[in-house]
From Swiss-Prot:
Family: Belongs to the universal ribosomal protein uL5 family.
Protein name in the entry: Large ribosomal subunit protein uL5
GO molecular function (one): tRNA binding
Gene Ontology CC annotation, any one: ribonucleoprotein complex
NCBIfam families per UniProt: PRK00010.1
Keywords: Ribonucleoprotein, Ribosomal protein, RNA-binding, rRNA-binding, tRNA-binding
Phylogenetic placement of the source organism: Bacteria, Pseudomonadati, Pseudomonadota, Alphaproteobacteria, Rhodobacterales
Function: This is one of the proteins that bind and probably mediate the attachment of the 5S RNA into the large ribosomal subunit, where it forms part of the central protuberance. In the 70S ribosome it contacts protein S13 of the 30S subunit (bridge B1b), connecting the 2 subunits; this bridge is implicated in subunit movement. Contacts the P site tRNA; the 5S rRNA and some of its associated proteins might help stabilize positioning of ribosome-bound tRNAs.
Length: 187
């Protein structure tokens, strides 16, 4: 990312210049504040049993997620002890990061244009993963699709969850917003 004061991420400019007007026309909004926009993107890597056996796995996941997001990831810990899984309270189990503003648009741009085309046998993402309130959740089987991760230096292949929160009131509005960003839905 550039540190220039007048720098605007590509997708943010596209949203401002074309997507807002298209959505306003499509759904007939009377007020500009009704137009859906991206609120935040949450990335999560859960290490599960790997972190229970080796506490360094959660640190590795945190480092990888920090590289992918461009922002320091926080470690997620167990809320309570579960003896059957050998999990103790406050034991590190993964990492998560919340992206907002310019970093959010930069990440979405890299996800759509670079990471998704690198997924093996990729035929688009499901259009059914909306929560009913305009938010979209998806999962990746491996984090190696991001160019920030050096294939030779990783010790574990992590899957990750990506949640895209929008201000849309319905799933149709959110899907239309994400399609305008060229999100490759298969349905």
């Amino acid at each position: 990312m550039l540190d220039s004061a007048n720098y605007t991420p590509r997708l943010k400019a596209v949203y401002r210049d074309t997507i807002r007007a298209a959505l306003k026309e499509e759904f007939g909004y009377k007020n500009d504040m009704q137009i859906p926009r991206l609120d935040k993107i949450v990335l999560n890597i859960g290490c599960g049993a790997e972190a229970v056996r080796d506490s360094k796995k959660a640190k590795s996941a945190q480092a990888d997620l920090t590289l992918i997001a461009g922002q320091k990831a926080m470690t997620t810990t167990a809320k309570k002890s579960i003896a059957g899984f050998r999990v103790r309270e406050e034991m590190p189990l993964g990492a998560k990061v919340t992206l907002r503003g310019d970093r959010m648009y930069e990440f979405l741009d890299r996800l759509i244009t670079i990471a998704m085309p690198r997924i093996r046998d990729f035929r688009g993402i499901s259009g059914k993963s909306f929560d009913g309130r305009g938010n979209y959740a998806m999962g990746l089987k491996e984090h190696l699709v991001f160019p920030e991760i050096d294939f030779d230096k990783i010790d574990e292949n992590w899957g990750m969850d990506i949640v895209i929160a929008t201000t849309a009131q319905t799933d149709a509005e959110a899907k239309s917003l994400l399609k305008a960003f060229n999100m490759p839905f298969n349905s």
